[in-house]
Amino acid sequence: MSQKILFIDRDGTLIEEPKSDFQIDTLEKLRFEKDAIPTLLKLKKFGFKFVMVSNQDGLGTPSFPKENFEIAHEKMLDILKSCGIEFQDIFICPHFENENCACRKPKTAMLEEYIKHELYDKEQSFVIGDRESDMILASNLGVRGLKYGALSWKEIENEILSSFRSASYQRTTKETDIKVKVCLNGGKVSIKTGIDFFDHMLEQIAVHGDIGLEISCKGDLEIDEHHSVEDVALALGACIKKALGDKIGIARYGFTLPMDECLASCAMDFCNRPHLVYKAKFKKSHLGALSTEMIEHFFYSLSYAMGVSLHLKVKGKNDHHKAEGLFKAFAKALKMAVKIESENLASSKGVI
């Protein structure tokens, strides 16, 4: 089974590399790079596995005795383990560059099993290192390389997470042309459906759900808003479902939210058994150019496209507040449900 793997360089990336001799052969030389450990802990929560790939020039020769190397190396691994970080595999090439061995980075001989058995997901795996050889290794593996030094560990974290749990989706019919982009870890918000009040409601999902959301819709508004609202819901739901991927680690569930004099509640379950229970009454037929009856239809279409069981209800006096409360409650429930809480799937069945 393909895994999300970070192939990580050691010296100069994970731990500081002494400029004097480029060898970490004493405990005094062992220092971690800033934010390396917290970043790896964060990425571990998102299901990434770690593989160390390091060139250690002349390891085992008189100039770099193996026992000296192992003292610092084992201490490093002990510290990482105490923090909750372990490497699935550790590959070390001990040769000098002029020996022209098959295993030295950027060659891939050390990773032959990973390549042969397709053990890493090329779309969701990365090489992290401080040298150009690491970037060439990334190219040889068919994954993206992130160069430490040009990027800090926090910037590397952001780069990885912005490409992870993200999706794009396009839905084109005779009635509408819709493009949606979702990043569940946050990002840009841009919504243009041609229905101002609907845009305002969709913005609540992005802002209060803390997600990046871009939606553009060209629809047959000269007829009415029905097709645009329905198809935006279908495209948005499909895009969120795509961004969630295998759903491993998500909380799965969530929320109740007061909105001025209103009380809106939303309960959500990413169970892949779509269902909607909706309890809301509006005095007005329209809010702006959006028919209030289309609010229920939006959530119905959205729940089926997302594959969620969705319970929504609101009570209050002001129709605008009630509508906004529903969208905000949905957003908060979504934020709670997609949050990574563990490394496991939240189901006793082993599948959602």
Curated annotation (Swiss-Prot):
Please state the protein's primary subcellular location: cytoplasm
Which PANTHER family has this protein been placed in?
A: IMIDAZOLEGLYCEROL-PHOSPHATE DEHYDRATASE (PTHR23133:SF2), IMIDAZOLEGLYCEROL-PHOSPHATE DEHYDRATASE HIS7 (PTHR23133)
Provide the E.C. number(s) assigned to this enzyme.
3.1.3.15, 4.2.1.19
Q: What name does UniProt use for this protein?
A: Histidine biosynthesis bifunctional protein HisB
Annotated Pfam families:
IGPD, PNK3P
What segment(s) does the record annotate as region Imidazoleglycerol-phosphate dehydratase? 165-352
Cofactor(s) needed:
Mg(2+); Zn(2+)
Positions binding Zn(2+) in this chain are: 93, 95, 101, 103
User: Quick one: a GO cellular component term?
Assistant: cytoplasm
Phylogenetic lineage: Bacteria, Pseudomonadati, Campylobacterota, Epsilonproteobacteria, Campylobacterales
Give the residues the record marks as binding Mg(2+): 9, 11, 130
Quickly give the catalysed reaction. D-erythro-1-(imidazol-4-yl)glycerol 3-phosphate = 3-(imidazol-4-yl)-2-oxopropyl phosphate + H2O; L-histidinol phosphate + H2O = L-histidinol + phosphate
**MF-aspect GO terms:** histidinol-phosphatase activity; imidazoleglycerol-phosphate dehydratase activity; metal ion binding
Q: Which family does it belong to?
A: In the N-terminal section; belongs to the histidinol-phosphatase family.
Q: Where is this region: Histidinol-phosphatase?
A: 1-164
User: Where does this protein act, in terms of pathway?
Assistant: Amino-acid biosynthesis; L-histidine biosynthesis; L-histidine from 5-phospho-alpha-D-ribose 1-diphosphate: step 6/9; Amino-acid biosynthesis; L-histidine biosynthesis; L-histidine from 5-phospho-alpha-D-ribose 1-diphosphate: step 8/9
